[in-house]
């Protein structure tokens, strides 16, 4: 029997489903937000203040990229006060997330149920979180006692090591290299691409697969859109909030994958489950699958077979 290998990828939608207000919009509307409309310290603060007033969905990292991108018509030279303010912004986000993760969680949330099933399954030896929160603390609050390992992709608030910023393929104006995530002193390499390549099954929960993080997943989705045999297909389950986010996610996949959506869907066991008004049949099938395809079930089957042979 081939060794099973499963991967869990966690995005901010996971923490939001727990009941925490961890979106950038939530941060921008909190008392921790260091941006002020009047008396801005630097052009970066002024730019963020303008954007927060006009954009319904406030994607902080995309706005940082937009501000520092090469070719903007104003502020061509890096302002010396921008970097200290960026550090202040990052520290403020750290304090905000810390106070959010100190709150209780919704123990009946889909996020908790999925985490319990994943940990109990036993084959998820690769768990990655793009969030800054403590997954062990979440597990304890959820009543999960089994041991598991996971990796932070962008640091964590517990170690004051969060990484915010922009991708490495966007050309930035001179002097704004500090905004690149891969340039952060806290950045650590990880084998996420290899784990995705080698796994039989992957579960995404609450990750938008947006272009800022898409380089982590680009090779995986490209490969799964060019399967040459049935055995190359994988089980891919994506948990997202609602139908609006489902369509956004599919559109993002289509754009980033050169329009190769049909092969991706047909050559893999791809399911998208919405956490608001979910398809209960689809949800139950997911949980039943993880229970059936688990280390415990396989051990029970082997023990049963051994007893029959004696």
What are these regions (language model features)?
Residues 2-8, 12-201, 207-310:
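Conserved catalytic-core helix/loop/strand module for nucleotide-ribose chemistry
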